[in-house]
From Swiss-Prot:
Keywords: ATP-binding, Cytoplasm, Decarboxylase, Gluconeogenesis, Lyase, Manganese, Metal-binding, Nucleotide-binding
Top-level taxon of the source organism: Bacteria
Biological processes annotated in GO: gluconeogenesis
InterPro entries to which the protein is assigned, alphabetical: PEP_carboxykinase_ATP (IPR001272), PEP_carboxykinase_C (IPR013035), PEP_carboxykinase_N (IPR008210), PEPCK_ATP_CS (IPR015994)
NCBIfam families named among the record's database cross-references: pckA (TIGR00224), PRK09344.1-1 (NF006819), PRK09344.1-2 (NF006820), PRK09344.1-3 (NF006821)
Protein name: Phosphoenolpyruvate carboxykinase (ATP)
Organism for this UniProt entry: Campylobacter jejuni subsp. jejuni serotype O:6 (strain 81116 / NCTC 11828)
Key word Manganese present: yes
Cofactor(s) listed: Mn(2+)
GO molecular function: ATP binding; metal ion binding; phosphoenolpyruvate carboxykinase (ATP) activity
ATP-binding listed as a keyword: yes
């Protein structure tokens, strides 16, 4: 118990430290924390919070970190006094109880990883941490020294939030100087995952290393590919390839040695999960995986089509559950980077080659377009721009990440492509969704290098280089103007989308890099 004195908890009844999967499973069952499915996967309900609470996330405003953090709606400031008050409250919640302490690494690169200790009173949350982070060896556990501690007091709420000037009784707070995070009022496991991701996005760029919200895989010739894209763009599907080993599906770093996964597991959406279309994820849901907010049938099988609790049903599992993964969780420098956008306006080409400067522009734009349905059945796509394809998790100014990306692209001569997995031949409602077959053909041509041999032409207004012909893709598809019957509607929509890009980018022009990068966007 002595080694846990620095946690600041009183009268702890018992500490369950780094339990095995079997031990965690026994505790989950004994504590009645959920149910087991027909194949013995444990399944929990995260309560009213079935997703992250971005409006309740704060950083303590103090020096020296205050001069690096980009303060605003995403990185909200909180005082040291209020942090201390809520940390004390969380510690009181965790005192006098049985607690679970789970130690893990974030980052598969020895020179860049961080050691994180998680403290919780819920066994399944320790299980989630064991799945999602890198599991230390026995020797590493014996010499474990935490760089950062997360207190997860999910049962603790802040009743005084109004007088404290906060948004709700939930709080997720990061104290960079003291290397502590505290979570209260939400049971959602993803807060721990994305919280440490946010911290990696603070630490690494200050060490001149890039942190990224992307998936990564590696081919038989050790050629590494990175896939960036917002939710619904096909990032997980397209990076899962039987011919390539999965490095990771969501969070990566890029240091002097190459690319490395931050995590030791995957956190996949399970809504409408189909064993035929996503056999790898379906096969990964077995003992040691942890299902969240799914609905079980009477025979304890999972009804993946049931969204009655939430659309955001999830499963976490150790990456070993994916057969074709890269065991070291790392590889060399990327050969190709692919930005995925599901453009519901039907304007972006199926594939375009980007210059280094354009890569920085489209990385900062982080564009996709979602389809919003209305009750009368009228649909108008909604443009979504998320800096660096992961704005909610980036504590520094987005141009910091873009500059690092540009430097690495140049140094390692990386090819960068923009791939549209969205609509063609018209906007949503008129055009049709790009076929997965055509998108796969574009991705394969990038990965096998055959696209480099193509003849390219300029795509007007956006000034993108697009291939004139590409094996496996109808030539008419390659330039969007050829796929629209109504050319006037095409020109109007193209100019409208270009204008959205330009307007969005104005927010980066508060720094000189932003002004510099803005030259490489669409020209209206």
């Amino acid at each position: 118990m002595k080694k846990f004195d620095n946690l600041g908890l009183d009268n702890i009844k018992e500490i369950f430290h780094n339990l095995s999967y079997d031990e965690l499973n026994a505790h989950e069952k004994a504590n009645n924390e959920g149910l087991s499915t027909d194949n013995d996967t444990f399944c929990v309900d995260t309560g009213i919070f079935t997703g992250r609470s971005p409006k309740d996330k704060y950083f303590v405003k103090q020096d020296p970190s205050s001069k690096y953090i980009a303060w605003g709606k995403i990185n909200q400031p909180i005082t040291k006094e209020l942090f201390d008050k809520l940390l004390t409250k969380a510690k009181q919640e965790l005192s006098g109880k049985k607690i679970y302490v789970q130690d893990a690494f974030c980052g598969a690169s020895l020179q860049s990883r961080k050691a994180v200790r998680f403290v919780t009173e819920i066994a399944w949350q320790a299980h989630f941490v064991k799945n999602m982070f890198i599991r230390p060896s026995q020797e590493e556990l014996e010499n474990f020294k935490a760089d950062f501690i997360v207190y997860n007091a999910c049962k603790c709420i802040n009743e005084d939030y109004k007088q404290d000037g906060l948004n709700s009784e939930v709080f997720v707070i990061f104290n960079v100087e003291e290397n502590i995070a505290v979570i209260g009022g939400t049971w959602y496991g993803g807060e721990m995952k994305k919280g440490i991701f946010s911290m990696m996005n603070y630490w690494l760029p200050l060490e001149n290393k890039l942190s990224m919200h992307c998936s990564a895989n590696v081919g038989e010739k050790d050629d590494v590919a990175l896939f960036f894209g917002l939710s619904g763009t096909g990032k997980t599907t397209l990076s899962t390839d039987p011919k390539r080993r999965l490095i990771g599906d969501d969070e990566h770093g890029w240091d002097d040695e190459g690319v490395f996964n931050f995590e030791g597991g995957c956190y996949a959406k399970t809504i409408n999960l189909d064993p035929e279309h996503e056999p790898e994820i379906y096969g990964a849901i077995k003992r040691n995986a942890l299902l969240e907010n799914v609905v079980l049938r009477a025979d304890k099988s999972v009804d993946y089509a049931d969204a009655s609790k939430t659309e955001n049903t999830r499963v976490s599992y150790p990456i070993e559950h994916i057969e074709n993964h890269e065991p070291s969780l790392k590889a060399g420098h990327p050969k190709n980077i692919i930005f995925l956008s599901a453009d519901a306006f039907g304007i972006l080409p199926p594939v375009s080659k980007l210059s280094k400067e354009q890569a920085m522009y489209y990385f900062l734009s982080g564009y996709t377009a979602k389809v919003a349905g209305t009750e009368r059945g009228i649909t108008e796509p909604q443009a979504t721009f998320s800096a660096c394809f992961g704005e909610p998790f980036m504590p520094l100014h987005p141009t910091v990440y873009a500059r690092l990306l540009g430097e690495k692209i140049e140094k390692h001569e990386v090819n960068v492509y923009l791939v549209n997995t969205g609509w063609s031949g018209g906007s949503y409602g008129v055009g049709k969704r790009m076929s997965i077959k055509a998108t796969r053909a574009c991705i394969n041509a990038i990965l096998d290098g055959s696209i480099a041999k193509c003849e390219f032409e300029n795509f007007e207004v956006f000034n993108l280089a697009i291939p004139k012909a590409l094996e496996g893709v109808e030539s008419t598809l390659l330039n969007p103007i050829n796929t629209w019957l109504d050319k006037n509607a095409y020109t109007e929509t193209r100019d409208k989308l270009a204008h959205m890009f330009v307007q969005n980018f104005k927010r980066y022009e508060d720094v000189k890099e932003g002004i510099e990068f803005s030259k490489f966007g669409p020209k209206i």
